[in-house]
Amino acid sequence: MYIMKLLIKEALEDALLKLNISRKVILTDAKDFGDFSSNIAMVLQKDLGKNPLEIAQMIVEKINKEKFLIEKIEIVKPGFINFFLDHKFYVYLLEKFSKNDFLIELEKTYTYNLEYVSANPTGFLHIGHARGAAIGDTLANILEFANNKVIREYYVNDAGNQISILAYALYIRYQQILGNKTLNLPEDSYHGEDIKYFAKIFHKKYQEKFKNVDYSLEVENFFKDEGVKIALEKIKLDLKTFRVEFDLYTSEKSIYPLIEKSLKKLKNTYEQDGALWLKTTDYGDDKDRVLIKNDGTYTYFAPDLAYHYVKKTRSENVDYLIDFFGADHIGYVKRMQIALEQFGFSKDTLNVLILEMVKLRKNGTEFVMSKRKGTAISLEDLIELIGVDNARFFLVDHSSSSKLDLEIDLIAEKNLSNGAFIIQYAYARTNSILEKTKVTLDVKLIRKPFDDKFEMKLVNVLKEFPILIEKIAENFKIHLLSQYLITLAKSFNSFYSNSKIIDSEEELKLILLVKATQAVLKKGLDLLKVEAPERI
């Protein structure tokens, strides 16, 4: 937690100032050897020409422990200074937590553009999209919680060949509803229930207006527009049910007029064989990339580059772009990052999180996802099978780059083998305790430290919360949050099982601990967008 580090840094800097020493102080987590540790004495060895242990002793003697809420300081070989915070600091910390002030304070905040899900508007969202939605939305929540500005964006791929396939599939299914049995879908079309659903929506809206109408270019374009509109409405509806909403939906078609202007901003393009190329091999790519083919058409790379240029240069003043790619697109990452450098952006402008496959199992059977064959497990199906809470939790409970097997039968069970339930159960238990207590929380009356091993373990887990949030805001590893909440819930349950709280001599202190735990569990569940039930 930044404020904890700041406190110890100030204590060290104050001591160094008294010794007329000017040096940058770096702290590390001490884990089992205190709250924080510093190697400043070893850093100063050469400058002062003294033994690090002697230097450490000089520094420690100048530290005002009471002022900086330090309980004790230990010096260990070869010269580390380990700091243990006073119990007054923990009372202060827990009181802040209990009032929903989690002391999140990054040294610097940024504006992020997160583009996630971005499924083609050609069918229902499936479980793979659900993983991207849960991870992207949770990361956006955490970044915002850490005081960053976040733009949530969905890129609507409405300009490719897949939209032509969608339009014709919609046309055929619509004609079949009207009784035309002579028309059949091509093998490479979309054969799923989603197209039948879209056709019913289309038929409800237009009745027999297009009955037996030839599939002309004009009709094709109409079915393209309507197909995308219907699919996108369904996508938005399912995402809302999944507690995911976006700030922007950007059409790929809207980017096309901006491609030529955007490509002119690239530094290292050249023409060869009638095509326009981007020189990427000089920056580590295995080959240069074609932007405009010799027939004048764009490669898929060109609109993608233009779109990223637009995102970076719009009025939001975005510092960083975060994309979510399927594992099958991992080779695309490097060339995108190289290309963005050619626009003059910094190397770390684009961050890409890889989303591995999700497999769903029920009764020992694996479902194979293929939208065109109609065997995909949709987001709607997933929610119906295990509920929004379980889906949101288990889709973010592992690293995004690891393959994920979801056992529906196990996840749906409400017991202590279910991580989401463990957290919700602990939260409900905190509510039960706080409903029973009659004490008025006045932290000034707390005199004794948290010295019981179950109390101290819970305090140590709680204090990690803001540190964890700050860490996730930097490394984007959101699975650490769900794992942390499980650890917190288990620590609380151990504390509860081994402590008399209500009517105990130390009830005031323990109620503060319960209240802080309740607040952290609630905030963690809110970030995951998993419900926090008052009772179970």
Swiss-Prot record:
Gene this chain is encoded by: argS
Pfam families cross-referenced by the UniProt entry: Arg_tRNA_synt_N, DALR_1, tRNA-synt_1d
Alphabetized HAMAP family for the sequence: Arg_tRNA_synth
Protein name according to UniProt: Arginine--tRNA ligase
Top-level taxonomic group: Bacteria
Compartment(s) where it occurs, according to its Swiss-Prot or TrEMBL record: Cytoplasm
Subunit structure: Monomer.
Family indicated by similarity: Belongs to the class-I aminoacyl-tRNA synthetase family.
Disulfide cross-links: none
SUPFAM superfamilies registered for this protein in UniProt: Anticodon-binding domain of a subclass of class I aminoacyl-tRNA synthetases (SSF47323), Arginyl-tRNA synthetase (ArgRS), N-terminal 'additional' domain (SSF55190), Nucleotidylyl transferase (SSF52374)
